[in-house]
Structures are given as C-alpha cells and as structure tokens.
Design a protein with these regions (language model features):
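Positively charged n-region of N-terminal signal peptides that target proteins for export
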Residues: 1-4
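Bacterial N-terminal signal peptides
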Residues: 8-17
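N-terminal signal peptide c-region/cleavage motif recognized by signal peptidases
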Residues: 19-21
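A generic "folded-domain core" signal
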Residues: 23-200
Length: 200
C-alpha cells in the first residue's frame, strides 16, 4: 500500500512538472532524462504531440547492479464527465499502437486539474530488444479504440462494450521517437552508476 501511494505521488508530481514546463527551450526531439531515488531509478520522458501534458515514460531501475529491463508506460489526460472513469483502473484497455491492435493496462487513475489522468502500462522488456524494436518507428502513436466483446469471451480484466469516447475526450496521441536511442543509452549509463551504499 505504501509503495502504491509513493508511486501515485511521484507520478502526480512528475506529470505536474511536465505540464508546467511548457516553455522549455529544449527542441521537440529532446528527451527528458531524470534521476530518482538517489539514482536507482531513471526516467526517460517525452511530451505528447496532441495533448502536450500526456507523457511517454520509459523507466530503468538498478537491481543488484544491473539495468537490463525497461518499463514502458504512457499517460492520457481526460476531461470526460463520466463518473465511472475511475473504474477502468486495473483493466486492460484496447488500443492501437502504430496500427497494431494491443491492450494497455490502466494501472492508475487519479484526479488531475479539471479531469483525470490515466497511467497505462505496456510491460517490461529487455533494453536491447526494446531498442531494436522501437527503432523501426519514427513515431509512437496510440489510439484508444472501441471493443465489443460477447459475454462468452469476457474476462474480469476487460470492460464489456468498451467505448473509448465514454472515457476519453481525446482518445489519441503520439510522441516523436527521434533521439530515443541516445536517451535510453544515457539513462542506462546513469542507472548503472547507482551504488547500493548510497541508501542506508
């Protein structure tokens, strides 16, 4: 419970910082590489092309001196008036990633400004394999899509007759991937510099 609360506040503060920083002098191809937890966790962040405050987030964590896994997630901001938006938390939501039909887990839903922010998790991957895959694309494009499932195929982690616009007023966003390799290499180098002795 404490870990979940910590993640909630860290992500909340992180997203607020990204939204406020709209006047950054950095070019659009620049990735924001940040250190957390005394350097044990490194974040690689990119703001969205459609909704600026939506963030593509790649996370590396030093585990026993190794930084071999990367966690992929992204956020969507919604101002829809649906009072049940919180109920998608923990559910797998249908999406299109660059025309591939997939699911993204709505890991967290929390109030933000005049609406809600939803953090989606896409899983963890081996860093080199992830880079090889992502370098095939120039853009990381996400569209939250509708899905009609019969009762026969329904699972507890899915939403029956899910309609994207019931939950998201802007159901799509994209992030430019230019410079992603350099950003991940930099993040992994920083991650490997972490020493367990830094935290008593």
């Amino acid at each position: 419970m404490l870990k979940r609360l910590l993640i909630f506040f860290v992500v909340h503060l992180l997203v607020i910082t990204v939204v406020i920083n709209t006047y950054s002098e950095a070019s659009e191809s620049t990735w924001d590489v940040r250190s957390m937890r005394s350097g044990q966790t490194i974040l690689v962040l990119k703001t969205g092309n459609v909704t600026y405050g939506d963030t593509l987030m790649l996370v590396l964590e030093n585990k026993n001196g190794k930084c071999e896994q990367i966690q992929e997630s992204f956020t969507f901001y919604t101002t829809t008036k649906n009072t049940e938006v919180k109920e998608i938390e923990g559910k797998n939501i249908p999406i299109k990633f660059n025309e591939l039909e997939l699911y993204a887990k709505a890991s967290y839903v929390f109030p933000f400004l005049l609406g809600h922010r939803v953090m989606f998790s896409m899983g963890s991957y081996e860093v080199n394999e992830y880079l090889e895959y992502m370098l095939k694309y120039e853009t990381y494009a996400i569209t939250i899509v509708d899905e009609n499932l019969s009762a026969r195929v329904m699972q507890p982690h899915l939403i029956k007759n899910f309609k994207a616009t019931d939950y998201f007023d802007v159901p799509n966003n994209s992030w430019d991937l230019k410079g992603v390799k350099e950003a991940i290499v930099k993040a992994q180098k920083l991650c490997l510099e972490y020493k367990e002795s830094k935290i008593s």
